Amino acid sequence: MKDFIAIDFETANECPSSVCSIGAVLVRDGEIVNSFYSLIRPEPDYYKWFCQQVHGLGHEDTDDAQVFPYVWNRMLSELLEEVEILSEDTSEMPTAIPLVAHNAGFDSRCLREVFRCYRMDYPEFVFHDTLAASKKYFQGTLENHQLQTVAAACGYDLTNHHHALADAEACAWIAREIL
């Protein structure tokens, strides 16, 4: 796969709409050409202890952050500024370029639910899953198929796991290798 956006969300609590950070990496012709990271004020705006233990984020990080619709539009504008796939209406994600995530079921659900939460029109994104792809590609040769394990098998050193941009970068690397 040569053209895609690798995306990763971290959530504040058990609600899929509670995205508190986003990382995205644009890959064109097999090369990483741009990336984006932002904190997001989650909705609902509360943190579960378990989630904080995973990613280390809390109210002190996101109380002054923008809500999702503003971050999404800024991401599209910044990530795709040099690319001709962005429509004039930056509220619409170009669905011609697929999204890639490790455990895409989680990230696609987060995206769908946060769009629903803010009553944004949800385009039918095409998602590819590096978790599912790694199970086929490595066929039982890995201890597990967690992001850091698969990234290492693909030659990528993921040093800041559960930081949304670091995870999106690892996902992009994996996708370039096995999709």
Task: Name what the model sees in each region.
Residues M1-C117, E124, N144-H162:
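Conserved non-catalytic scaffold segment of RNase H-like nuclease domains
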Residues T11-N13, A132, A170:
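Short, glycine/acidic-enriched loop or turn micro-motifs at the edges of active sites
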Residues L79-E81, D129, Q139, A175-L179:
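Short alpha-helix boundary/capping motifs
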Residues D107, V126, D167-A170:
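Catalytic-loop motifs flanking and including active-site residues across diverse enzymes
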Residues V114-Y118, K136, A153, I174-I178:
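Active-site catalytic microenvironments for nucleophilic, acid-base chemistry
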Residues H128-N144:
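Short alpha-helix plus adjacent loop in nuclease-associated cores
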Residues H163-R176:
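Acidic, divalent-metal-coordinating active-site segment for phosphoryl/phosphodiester hydrolysis
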